[in-house]
Amino acid sequence: MEVRSESNITQARSDKLPLPPAVPKPRVQVWFVRVCSSILVWTCLVQLFAAGELWHSRIFTGLTNQISRFSAPVEPVPLPPPLPPPRNYTSNGILLVSCNGGLNQMRSAICDMVTVARLLNLTLVVPELDKTSFWADPSGFEDIFDVRHFIDSLRDEVRILRRLPKRFSRKYGYQMFEMPPVSWSDEKYYLKQVLPLFSKHKVVHFNRTDTRLANNGLPLSLQWLRCRVNFQGLKFTPQLEALGSKLVRILQQRGPFVALHLRYEMDMLAFSGCTHGCTEEEAEELKKMRYTYPWWREKEIVSEERRAQGLCPLTPEEVALVLKALGFEKNTQIYIAAGEIYGSEHRLSVLREAFPRIVKKEMLLESAELQQFQNHSSQMAALDFMVSVASNTFIPTYDGNMAKVVEGHRRYLGYKKTILLDRKRLVELLDLHHNKTLTWDQFAVAVKEAHERRAGAPTHRRVISDKPKEEDYFYANPQECLCEGTNCHDLFGHRNLTH
């Protein structure tokens, strides 16, 4: 039997007894710090609210706005407009087109080719742009226009492919039928002579597209489609749109501005044979250039005869006198919507002296912003197009493609002021003033009288049935698209449209 000592029993009992409670000194200290901190924080908050009430602290207001913003319901992001349903039709073939000329000539041609494709129930391939003309611009359609928008926005009219299917390409041995459509052709020509070609060839390539559709005599639905493509289907790329908008914004911040389409560029002078104001060396240089391009048909041109007929662009010196005579003041802001002026800044000196606030895109934008568009004349022309359309007043010094297309666009936007210079009359007046026959006051009065009805107001297109090249261009005045319904007499008045 095991015997335990008293001391051992006492030790065992003492191990089972609870220890007396210790004083929690660290916990008291923690609670004390917390109470003091709370008092301090509440004091600061009270002071902050008081300061906000007294001085409307922007910091506190911003904080409140942030809280409200996060607590308020989130506004849904607006969805893009729904796409029109695709038109369901049996395609008669594929139309491939190669546009020729500068940006605005190609723009009009694209509108015409979409319309032809719709008329003939064809599938259109996104048009190829001119890369071999004087400007040698390598830009493709996708470098200038928003391809996705072009295809989607017109899909209820025409089926458009990004590229020609491989089986129809020359690379795979397909012999494509090429042709230039007859200029100024009507609906009957395309239905009777062009449509049968697709039954035989499936793919037809139009290798020239300038002015291949008549100005007049087409069904109203086709004229409307030409306008729809021009005003809605053809959007510039987001990059071009952004830079063009920035240019317009800079100009508008400086006040109203005139967009002057000063078509005094080397290619135009060489093509037209207009050398008034040029030195003998410059005239010879322009003549040599004219002979360099075989597709420029006229070679021997008498400059002064051409000028007297009103067929030459005004010189910068002549423009200075005309603008002053029209009443534009010296502080008028003028944007030069053009490429390189022939003779450079030297030829602009008189115009700049008369109107010191002359600017160009190169003066308004950083060189880095323009760098990606340099050596791409069509992309630079797109910037000038956007500025010209947005200007308070547009004045072209020559009636080329840009002048005409911008004029029509400004009519579509509500007949914005566009001064269409009567160059034939102006040449007469300028010469009379130059030889002292007319005083300045007489000259100014005569210039204003000559342009009272040439500011872009509503009017009918002039129709010359047997001379379509001499009649008013559809895209300069798309009158069918500028009034509601099919009857435009209320807008234009009752007039005979032909002569």
From Swiss-Prot:
- Show the GO MF annotations: glycosyltransferase activity
Q: Name one GO biological process term.
A: pectin biosynthetic process
Source organism, top-level taxon: Eukaryota
- Cellular component terms (Gene Ontology): Golgi membrane
* Keyword annotations: Carbohydrate metabolism, Cell wall biogenesis/degradation, Fucose metabolism, Glycoprotein, Glycosyltransferase, Golgi apparatus, Membrane, Signal-anchor, Transferase, Transmembrane, Transmembrane helix
Reactions the enzyme catalyzes: alpha-D-galacturonosyl-[(1->2)-alpha-L-rhamnosyl-(1->4)-alpha-D-galacturonosyl](n) + UDP-beta-L-rhamnose = [(1->2)-alpha-L-rhamnosyl-(1->4)-alpha-D-galacturonosyl](n+1) + UDP + H(+)
Residues binding substrate: 261-263
List the pathway annotation: Glycan metabolism; pectin biosynthesis
Subcellular location(s): the record lists: Golgi apparatus membrane
Q: Which residues are glycosylated?
A: 88, 121, 207, 375, 435, 496
Glycosyltransferase as a keyword?
yes
* Entries under CDD domains matching the protein: O-FucT_plant
EC number(s) on file: 2.4.1.351
How is the protein disposed in the membrane? Single-pass type II membrane protein
Q: Where are the transmembrane segments?
A: 31-50
The family classification in the record reads: Belongs to the glycosyltransferase GT106 family.
PANTHER family, sorted: OS02G0726500 PROTEIN-RELATED, RHAMNOGALACTURONAN I RHAMNOSYLTRANSFERASE 1
Q: What does this protein do?
A: Glycosyltransferase involved in the formation of rhamnogalacturonan I (RG-I) oligosaccharides in the seed coat mucilage, which is a specialized cell wall with abundant RG-I. Transfers the rhamnose residue from UDP-beta-L-rhamnose to RG-I oligosaccharides.
Q: Which protein, by its recorded name, is this?
A: Rhamnogalacturonan I rhamnosyltransferase 1
The organism encoding this protein is: Arabidopsis thaliana
